[in-house]
Amino acid sequence: YYRKKLRTGKGLAVHCNHKVVAVYVFIMLACVLFTVWTLYTGKIEICYGENEFTVQAEGWQDYTVKYDAIDRIACEENMFRDTNTIRTNGFGNLKYSMGHFRDEIHADYIRYTHNDCDTYVVMEVEGSTVILNGADDAQTREIYNNIRERMEK
């Protein structure tokens, strides 16, 4: 059949429904936009109260810590360079890591961090490890100093 059509010069006509093509293009663009949006969205803010602070996380649940529940606090650098960190429950993208994690250094811990900053505030809170940071080293050290000052009151 195909060879006959080619010999006569007619070839095969391809019919496409332009509405179907438009729907497929729309769905594909929506998927691409959603993927890009998810890779770069989120926000982490720390709100300090008199007795506690709250990590407000856009894209994941907020986390509140009472100052008197903090057993130990430290500011550490480059903790996750050579570790095999696994997110066990949470949210993460190219900018943020939030939720429950596991690695060989801290075992199971809670983390609300910016991925571009290698300085971290590490706290032991009632037997659990909580790790925070800011967008850069200066913000992280400010978080550390703010929490430390409020713990001493």
Which residues make up each language-model segment?
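Conserved beta-hairpin
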Residues: 35-67, 72-74
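Non-transmembrane, membrane-adjacent beta-strand/coil modules in membrane-associated proteins
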Residues: 57-65, 72-126
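A short linear-motif detector with a strong N-terminal bias
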Residues: 24-27, 32-35, 43-44, 50-53, ...
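Alpha-helical transmembrane spans
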Residues: 1-43
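A signal for specific C-terminal beta-sheet/loop modules enriched in small/flexible residues
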Residues: 12, 62-85, 138-153
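Short low-complexity stretches enriched in small and charged residues
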Residues: 21-32, 49-50, 77-91
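Terminal and domain-flanking low-complexity segments
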Residues: 1-5, 9-11, 114-153
